[in-house]
Design a protein with these regions (language model features):
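Bacterial N-terminal signal peptides
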Residues: 11-23
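Solvent-exposed beta-hairpin/edge-strand motifs
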Residues: 55-75, 317-329
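Solvent-exposed beta-strand/loop surfaces of large extracellular or lumenal domains
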Residues: 70-97, 453-455
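An acidic-aromatic substrate-binding cleft motif
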Residues: 120-159, 163-166, 171, 332-338, ...
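Beta-strand/loop-rich accessory regions of lumenal/periplasmic or secreted enzymes
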Residues: 138-512, 557-560, 576-579, 663
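Well-ordered alpha-helical scaffold segments within catalytic/enzyme domains
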Residues: 264-268, 477-482, 584-598, 613, ...
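Solvent-exposed loop and edge beta-strand segments that line ligand/cofactor-binding
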Residues: 459-461, 465, 569-581, 651-665, ...
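Long, well-ordered core segments of solenoidal/helical folds
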Residues: 539-552, 604-619, 682-703, 731-746
Length: 746
């Protein structure tokens, strides 16, 4: 037996122990790495909600719990961090987060993350969401001072639930802070009429009935900020009027008594009276048996004759205030193109009067030819804001900010539109006899919205009208507040309420440092704006400023136009809407992150908002089985429903009108996905997924897998796959990439 001496193995043990210590020290050092991201809030107003998307370099963050926000003094402030996407399949680390916080007095903040960092969960105020998924259930949101409920369905059921109003069925405001009681109810919703899209045709007016079918807590819902998606349909009495889908996203905030409502409707009417042929247009045919003959269409006057028009569109609340109500609003003193100062207005409604604020402008339906400014002078006398008691003389100006308050001596409701002027016509109306407050995205007090063509000529290669299936999203603010000094905590409660909604109408813009966006490589290799290439940067700035200048000079405003740009300048006139060709909105997002310029952010947001809705086809969709009922029969009933349009998710071609020409390749989702990442806009990803589904269906056969259809689809699918990790989209993308590679050798 060998005699092993201790000294013969001692050096090995010491060596292994040393390696172990060094390894753990290296691990400790690696874990202690932290990252600091400078964030600036432009045009800051303290205590304003801030939501921004921040990209994270690959391999540096695996949990959103390891992220916090510091103020300008290095102190952690309450924040809500949401994991949005990862670097998969390359790496399981986080690629995008949403950072939410309320701004403070200073403009500068730091987002900090690392393995030794934890979010302190410093929540002195939180909100809660209870979402009952039953067919006659409801969603209840409680922010602390505000509680509201949205009912689902047409009523009845096991609990004999009331029919939904289509919007907020009950709103309570707890000014005393002692819990919600019966006398805290400040507004309710009229059954099926708190959300409306009324259609007018030759048979007369057909008022809608709104039915909520589904409520969802969106990604990004947490203790400080909730996003509630409300899906439903408008139903009509006459069978010739198709049901129309709507989606609302309601944003609520901890400790706040205001909400932001993003209201999206889809137009499902028959836009004009031309004689329809059976079949499809040659440019977008999915078969070869039935092809439309466009020759007789050129002689059909029905294209210029409106059929189903929008008579009224908007939201309504029935307020529960005292009889001694007063209404407040304001308008700008200057010309429409130079709004600087405002004049305030208030009057008592005496329990029976109605009051409205209406913003109008030229060519409401925006059917060409469009009236615009000349080369050297602005348009004059074409925009009008009017306000006053209904039935009496009204005051007028050219432009109004777009808010109204109805209040008694204790409580009030203030409602406002984003882009009240730019997306005219809009109206805010209070009827103190009926106790209703109406926010009209399209008011019945102007001519109905028409979707007819300007003529029956060819427009971008087609004689067609594809208005059926377009959508539009409108943003509104609803603020429920106290009106006396004690309940509001303000020395001037009405002024502060107005200032609050005006801040929310044009909120501050949060932006991480351009260097961080570049370092993350979330957008690939990207150079930030720099003096190193001053001449190049100057040319870029001139291009973007020139586009903004023309948008505001002409102006390219109106509900169906705002966010888009005309393309060609010929014989002193701008012509042909761009319709996002090619990815115009995306370049604004890129320039925003390169520079931090808040003006670029606002144009990017408006451009994406327009193109994803107006410049796309959204209806009729294939039936979707959600599975929110207990009966298995429902799945088979859904499957037996007719299939939708093959063109869902396909964009529109540049044309003189937004809805007169389609082409299979013409859709660009990069800006929409960027709005989802950078701005938390769920609508952007929602519409991008419509395009992904369109690719998966391959409705154009081999045609859709060649030429620019192929390379544009690869770009679009790459953006959507990165955001969703959907295996069906991934398989479609990889097959198309393989085809594109093979074409290099064939």
């Amino acid at each position: 037996m060998k005699n092993y001496q201790p000294f013969t193995i001692k050096p090995i043990i010491i060596f292994l122990i040393g390696i172990f210590i060094l390894h753990n020290q290296a691990g400790i050092q690696a874990q202690s790495i932290s990252y600091s991201i400078p964030v600036e809030v432009k045009d800051n107003v303290p205590d304003t909600p801030q939501l921004l998307g921040i990209p994270i370099p690959k391999g540096t963050l695996y949990s959103s719990d390891y992220v916090r926000v510091l103020n300008a003094y290095g102190q952690e402030i309450p924040s809500q961090i949401t994991k949005v996407s990862t670097w998969e399949p390359a790496d399981a680390s986080i690629k995008w987060i949403w950072v939410f916080f309320f701004s403070e007095e200073e403009d500068s903040y730091t987002v900090e993350y690392g393995d030794d960092i934890r979010n302190g969960r410093l929540y002195d105020k939180v909100l809660t969401v209870n979402n009952n998924q039953r067919p006659t259930g409801e969603v209840e949101v409680n922010t602390g001072p505000l509680r509201f409920t949205i009912e689902k369905g047409i009523g009845g059921g096991y609990l004999n639930a009331p029919p939904s109003s289509g919007f907020m069925d009950k709103v309570e405001l707890d000014l005393e802070g002692d819990g919600f009681e019966e006398d805290d109810v400040i507004a309710t919703g009229a059954a099926q009429r708190a959300n409306f899209l009324d259609i007018l045709d030759d048979a007369g007016l057909d008022p809608s009935k709104a039915v909520v079918t589904r409520t969802v807590k969106e990604l990004g819902t947490g203790p400080l900020h909730a996003i509630i998606r409300v899906e439903g349909e408008y139903h009509y009495e006459r069978e010739d009027n198709n049901s129309a889908p709507f989606v609302m996203r309601i944003h609520a905030y901890a400790g706040k008594s205001y909400v932001r409502v993003q209201h999206t409707f889809v137009y499902t009417g028959v836009p004009d009276k031309h004689t329809k042929q059976l079949g499809e247009y040659e440019a977008i045919a999915t078969q070869m048996e039935n092809i439309i003959d466009e020759e007789p269409l050129s002689q059909d006057p029905g294209f210029t004759q409106a059929n189903d028009r929008i008579a009224a569109l908007g939201l309504r609340l029935d307020y529960k205030l005292k009889d001694n109500t007063t209404v407040y609003t304001e308008a700008f003193n200057e010309a429409w193109y130079n709004p600087m100062t405002t004049q305030a207005f208030s009057t008592s409604l005496e329990g029976q009067k109605a009051f409205s604020l209406l913003q109008s402008g030229p060519n409401l339906s925006q059917i060409p030819p469009l009236e615009n400014s000349g080369s050297n002078a602005r348009m004059e006398g074409v925009f009008e804001a009017s306000w006053g008691i209904e039935g009496g003389s009204k005051s007028t100006a050219e432009r109004a900010p777009g808010w109204i308050t109805i209040a008694d001596d204790e409580r009030g409701i203030t409602v406002a539109f984003d882009q009240f002027f730019e997306e005219y016509p809009k109206e805010l109306m209070v009827d103190d006899d009926a106790k209703t407050l109406q926010a009209y995205a399209w008011t019945p007090n102007v001519e109905p919205l028409s979707f007819a063509k300007q003529n029956n000529n060819t427009d971008s290669g087609m004689i067609a009208n594809f208005a059926q299936g377009l959508a539009k999203t409108t943003d509104m603010i609803f603020f429920f507040h106290g009106t006396d000094k004690a309940s509001s905590g303000s020395a001037q409660p009405q002024v502060d309420a107005a200032n609050q909604v005006k801040t929310l109408m044009r909120p501050p813009v949060a932006h991480a440092s351009p260097e961080w966006y570049s370092k993350s490589e979330a957008f690939g290799k990207m150079a930030v704006a720099s003096d190193a290439f001053a001449d190049y940067e100057r040319h870029l700035d001139h291009k973007f400023d020139w586009m903004r200048y023309n948008q505001q000079w002409e102006p390219w405003y109106g509900m169906l136009n705002y966010g888009d740009f005309l393309t060609y300048y010929y014989r002193n006139e701008w012509q042909m809407w761009t319709n996002n060709e090619p990815a115009n909105d995306y370049m604004w997002w890129l320039q925003f992150i390169r520079t931090g310029n808040p003006d670029y952010y606002r144009v990017a947001k408006a451009s994406s908002k327009h193109t994803m809705d107006i410049d796309n086809v959204h209806w009729p969709k294939d039936p979707e089985y959600v599975g929110d009922t207990n009966e298995s029969l429902h799945a088979f009933q859904w499957a037996a429903q007719p299939k939708g349009s093959p063109y869902i998710g396909m964009g529109r071609r540049h044309a003189d009108q937004h809805y007169t020409s389609l082409l299979s390749a013409h859709v660009w989702v990069a800006g929409w996905v960027s709005s989802y990442y950078l701005d938390g806009n769920h609508r952007g990803l929602e519409v991008a997924k419509e395009t992904a589904n369109y690719y998966v269906k391959r409705v154009f056969g081999e045609h859709g897998l060649t030429g620019r259809r192929l390379y544009l689809s690869v770009w679009n699918l790459a953006e959507i796959v990165d955001a969703t990790k959907n295996p069906d989209y991934t398989a479609e993308l990889m097959d198309r990439v393989e085809r594109m590679v093979q074409f290099q050798y064939d």
